[in-house]
Every structure is written in C-alpha cells, then in structure tokens.
Regions:
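Short, flexible loop motifs at catalytic/binding sites
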Residues: 1-191
Length: 191
C-alpha cells in the first residue's frame, strides 16, 4: 500500500456514457487496445540507444501492427466533450495503474484552473471519490495524488521569452499527458 495513507475507493460508480464520436476518441486512448483488430498491445524490444538503454515500441499481439497512435488529437466544435473525455482518460488511467505521472496542460495555469482542472475534480466527485480519503490536492504544487501514488500534474505551456526551449520542464518524466486547447500553444511546447 502507498505510504501516503490514502485509501482505494470501494463500491464506486463510474458513470461514463460517451457519444459515438467521443467513443471513437476514447478507444484510441486505451493503452492496451489495438485500433485495427481490438487485440492486446505489448511492448517489443526494437534496439538500444547510445547509452545501451533498451528501446521499446508498442505492437499488437495479434496483427503485429506497430502503426499504433502515440499522439492523439481530437478536434471539433466547442461543447463536443473533448476536454471531458481527456479528463476521464487521465482520471481512469491514474485509478487503473499505480505510479502514473499524468500531465494536464493548457496555455496558462489560470485558464487550466478555471476549466479542465474543475472538470477533473467534478469527475472525481461524480464517481464517488473523496478528497483526503482517496486522493489529495496540493494547490501550491498543482498536483492531485491518488491512493496508489499516481498523480495528475498541472502544467502551463505558454511560450516564455526567457525560456524559449522550455528548459523549465528539464528532464521531467511523464507517463501520459493531455494538452487542452492545443491550438493555443506553439508546436515547440508540445514537443
């Protein structure tokens, strides 16, 4: 059990009924689903880098396809539920897997706190999770930590003249990320 004294929820009710278009996006976000045949995904050793670290690539166990999404973009008009589906994906991934380091990002922290962050907190409440029991929020650090040590981290993606290469992110390692309103930020910030 995690040392943070939080507890796994019991008897939670997850109410998620995506529209057909939302469901298409949701299917692509599943880490163990091949969009071609529906089979399970495995990580296959493809070689080693210069420091002799193993390099893996996802591959379908059944059809052997390596043409699997690594970057998924959802588009459409306002009100289509893209932010909601992305928020459900972050929360459900953190609940499903321990030690996930998930990022939710937007151009400014202010706009993130006023929108997507509220959506994430609403999902947690709607699913019956309790703050300081199943998860805790650190508003100063901009983190939401689950009982299993998975964490959602808020990040600002604005271009800052004093940091044109986004060195403020350093060697940060994240498992998954969702950038809301990606059209508002530069391509370099996404890289």
């Amino acid at each position: 059990m995690a040392v943070n004294k939080l507890k796994a929820p019991r008897n939670i009710h997850i109410d998620f009924s995506p529209s057909p278009r939302q469901y298409e996006l949701w299917k692509l976000l599943q880490p163990n689903y091949c969009p071609h045949c529906g089979a399970e995904i495995e990580q296959v050793l493809v070689g080693y880098d210069q420091q002799r670290n193993p390099q893996y690539k996802p591959q379908c166990k059944h059809c052997k396809s390596q043409n699997l999404p690594q970057l998924i973009l959802g588009g459409g008009a306002a009100g289509g539920g893209k932010s909601y589906v992305g928020s459900v994906w972050l929360v459900s991934s953190c609940m499903r897997f321990e030690n996930i380091r998930a990022v939710v990002a937007r151009k400014t922290l202010k706009s993130l706190k006023e929108s997507t962050w509220n959506t994430i907190k609403t999902i947690l409440k709607d699913w019956g999770l309790k703050e300081d029991v199943n998860y805790k929020i650190n508003n100063l650090e901009g983190t939401l930590t689950f009982w299993n040590d998975s964490v959602i981290i808020m990040k600002e993606m604005a271009d800052i003249p004093s940091d044109p290469n986004f060195e403020r992110f350093g060697s940060s390692e994240y498992t998954i990320a969702m950038v809301d309103e990606v059209s508002e930020i530069s391509e370099k910030s996404v890289e």
